[in-house]
Amino acid sequence: MQTAEIGIIGGSGLYAMPGLTGVREHVVETPFGEPSDALMLGELEGRRVAFLARHGRGHRLLPSELNFRANIYAMKELGVERILSVSAVGSLKEEHKPTDFVIPDQFIDRTFARVGTFFGEGVVAHVGFGDPVCATVAETFALACAEIGVVGKRGGTYVCMEGPQFSTRAESNLYRSLGADVIGMTNLQEAKLAREAEICYATMAMVTDYDCWREGHDDVTVEQVVAVLHQNSENAAKVVKAAVRAMPKERTCGCGEALKYAILTDRAAIPKAAKERLGLLLEKYL
């Protein structure tokens, strides 16, 4: 039975979902360990929703400490078909100003200490990731920004860095030379794992600062980030609410069949332990 149809992952500044009614806390156990926190289940704009605070309530977890596999698996277990992600980012372009929202459609991976797949240990799968976000969810985010009257820029490249330190000036300028738009520490692994779980995914990145590349502008600090987050979290919640309301009920994209031709391992060669661990993802293909 589907417990939730839409998942919301709230990042820095969005630790709860205003307007969520009939809220009940749900603790999920996964084959990959515990998610960042209990998931909050309820209704938002007449839709069944599961909300997860990415860093845990009280912001307890570093980006490198996040159990991305458990977070996405928990959403899958609850029946979630679409994930709306919200996160804080630094801007790598003059045109993306603090308090703007950017809805990226590409990623560059600069992480090195994370697991970004459910597979391995007996199962080999290679999902397509040329277009790493769901166009339907991204467009719904963009339309919701327009409805609320905030700047929501569709498209762009998100650099995902390891952290927890912010960039050096050399790194920031390198990413700018690549044409990247924003920089953050969390969204790439979510996008990869959501694709493997056949869940539609897109993120709305809240610009809080100009990283450290901009001459005549202070380098990014936590104090600066928090100040902008407090200013913008209300708008972020309004956009998410509008996006949930406008989200099409039926999926017409290809996200729901991402694994159809991706599994290379002979079905007869998949170990029993792997089938048990990945049954939720593989059941329709075994």
Residue ranges of model-derived segments:
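Non-catalytic positions within long, well-ordered alpha-helices that form the structural scaffold/packing
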Residues: K76-G79, R176, R195
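A short, charged, Gly/Pro-tolerant segment at domain boundaries
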Residues: T252-L286
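Short acidic/polar active-site loop segments enriched in Thr and Asp
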Residues: E81-R82, D181, C200
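Generic non-transmembrane alpha-helical segments
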Residues: T136, T140-V151, K238-A246
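Metabolite-binding pocket within alpha/beta catalytic cores that recognizes anionic/polar moieties
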Residues: M1-D131, Y285-L286
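Active-site/ligand-binding-proximal alpha/beta "capping" segment
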Residues: E147-D181
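Zn-dependent metallopeptidase/amidohydrolase metal-coordination segment
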Residues: M185-E223
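His/Asp/Glu-rich mid-to-C-terminal helical/loop segments that flank catalytic regions of hydrolases
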Residues: C212-L259
